[in-house]
């Protein structure tokens, strides 16, 4: 009996020791962080943040790549990663509403802005009464475009329309503009259409024909845009030291320069 007791005691002590080791391994390392990013050209931007974090703050950043926009928030919510950097606020808000995630933004990165482009005019003063203005037809980017047209004074929308207004929400149109909704990939080609005076195009499609917001846009979203991209973490992790260090590293001149290089001058600081 005594032998059995000693054996059980030894096993219990061993299990207890292993449990303690396990707890130690699960503790968060303030000098290490796993960050979810989207694979592709834009991955080059957090790669620079990774280097800045190591050089300036002694933080080891492990980048975890994803091929779509759904999995990074799912992985973050489950605790598989500590933060992610890929989405703007309207998208995050919709994810929180649809999926009930307990996630929070802890820092801004960049606005990759939509802008107004034209081959017919060089300023809004030249925009004639009754001109046709092309905008993307998907709900998110249509709303984004209409809000930008309102911001520059071309139209006025109903109060309280939020981030998804439609042309039915236009209540003032002093130049009697004709808003033409097109598939987003068609917008760059619409600039050659004799009937289109102006097109609102996002950075991805504008860059395909060599246009950049800062250089070629007649008007451009600014850093106050609700579409600024974010660094996001879990609510219970928002004050973690490794998260704070990563935000500081991302919001650096080195990362800003990298973003502008990758997006041909199309990145606007969001901080």
Could you tell me what each predicted segment is?
Residues 106-155:
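A conserved helix-loop-strand patch within extracytoplasmic ligand-binding domains
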